[in-house]
Amino acid sequence: MSETGTATEKPLFGRPWIFIRGVPAMKFLPPEGPPEIAFAGRSNVGKSSLINALVGHKGLARTSNTPGRTQELNYFVPEGYSGEPGDLPPMALVDMPGYGYAQAPKDHVDAWTKLVFDYLRGRATLKRVYVLIDSRHGIKKNDEEVLSLLDKAAVSYQVVLTKTDKIKDVGVPRLIGETLEKIRKRPAAYPEVLATSSEKSFGLDDLRAEIVRTVLL
């Protein structure tokens, strides 16, 4: 277990975070600069809730019980930086539209999916993708497709199990083991699976510490 509030974590997670930009298409991406950490996952897997829990701000990333509510690449950074050269934030968190089911017209869903895939394939400052998997359902076919895309693009990713408070405690270690076995031969997968619960604040320190290590690499 990581130590909360270490010197390396303080600059990233010891201050308020703000929303800076929603990106509906690749041409609206900010200039490449600070390292980016992205969160991917099926619709309603809990991406926005996890980001809010990580930074300690419940209303930062917009959450909804309606799958497919996030429709853009949403950028969040620590507060206190002008964004001018020489005063850039140390990193950005990117909340991506969910893939899979969404209550929206098919052409909209197709556009979000293309945006996500184009971003994952072609962003030089993308340091790691955290692929969120609902612990109640495990890795599904559309998750496998995203993992394969990341493998082909040689983009480092790590699997994070969400909503572990919804399953029995004894089931978490088993699920971690099963998930590790599924990704064992994937070339771009980080060989450690994290288990989290935004509702119970479980596993958040471990995820924060992993993000810090990734950004500082």
UniProtKB/Swiss-Prot annotation:
One of its GO terms (biological process) is division septum assembly. GTP binds at residues 41-48, 68-72, 95-98, 162-165, 196-198. GO terms for molecular function: GTP binding; metal ion binding. PANTHER family: ENGB-TYPE G DOMAIN-CONTAINING PROTEIN, MSS1/TRME-RELATED GTP-BINDING PROTEIN. CDD domains: YihA_EngB. Disulfide bonds: none annotated. It holds the Pfam family MMR_HSR1. Residues 33-217 form the EngB-type G domain. Belongs to the TRAFAC class TrmE-Era-EngA-EngB-Septin-like GTPase superfamily. EngB GTPase family. It comes from the Bacteria. Necessary for normal cell division and for the maintenance of normal septation. The keyword Nucleotide-binding applies. GO terms for cellular component: cytosol. The keyword Lipoprotein does not apply. Keywords: Cell cycle, Cell division, GTP-binding, Magnesium, Metal-binding, Nucleotide-binding, Septation. Its cofactor is Mg(2+). The gene is engB. Mg(2+) binds at S48, T70. SUPFAM superfamilies: P-loop containing nucleoside triphosphate hydrolases. This is Probable GTP-binding protein EngB.
